[in-house]
Amino acid sequence: MIQSQTHLNVADNSGARELMCIRIIGTSNRRYAHIGDVIIAVIKEAVPNSPLERSEVIRAVIVRTSKELKRDNGMIIRYDDNAAVVIDQEGNPKGTRIFGAIARELRQLNFTKIVSLAPEVL
């Protein structure tokens, strides 16, 4: 469960290392975001000499959460960290590599480019 002011790791090589959630895209009174939700975030830590800079406002999609994800078949998936991938306005990732495992639910939400770049899909 990601809410406003939550810090997330970045799971790609876009140049950002840590994000802080500002807003959850969707309805106006939505409190929590889960895997596959798009958020507006600010970059808290960035790699030197990268195209993304600290305090830049960006869009990101959540790919891992510490809170359990329960599937329809009864399987429960929980990750060690909260992580997101930086995306552009069309939903394409800004980085060229994805680090770590991501959930299968992203394919159903039309983030196929992120799924194809990921080394492991759970």
Curated annotation (Swiss-Prot):
Pfam family, one: Ribosomal_L14
This protein's UniProt keywords: Chloroplast, Plastid, Ribonucleoprotein, Ribosomal protein, RNA-binding, rRNA-binding
CDD domains assigned: Ribosomal_uL14
GO MF assignments: large ribosomal subunit rRNA binding; structural constituent of ribosome
Chief localisation class: plastid
InterPro entries, per database record: Ribosomal_uL14, Ribosomal_uL14_bac-type, Ribosomal_uL14_CS, Ribosomal_uL14_sf
Protein's cellular compartments: Plastid, Chloroplast
Gene Ontology biological process terms, A to Z: translation
Gene3D superfamilies: Ribosomal protein L14
GO CC terms in record: chloroplast; cytosolic large ribosomal subunit
Listed SMART domains: Ribosomal_L14 (SM01374)
Known role: Binds to 23S rRNA.
Family statement: Belongs to the universal ribosomal protein uL14 family.
PANTHER family recorded: 50S/60S RIBOSOMAL PROTEIN L14/L23 (PTHR11761), LARGE RIBOSOMAL SUBUNIT PROTEIN UL14M (PTHR11761:SF3)
Record's subunit section: Part of the 50S ribosomal subunit.
Protein name (Swiss-Prot/TrEMBL): Large ribosomal subunit protein uL14c
Annotated gene: rpl14
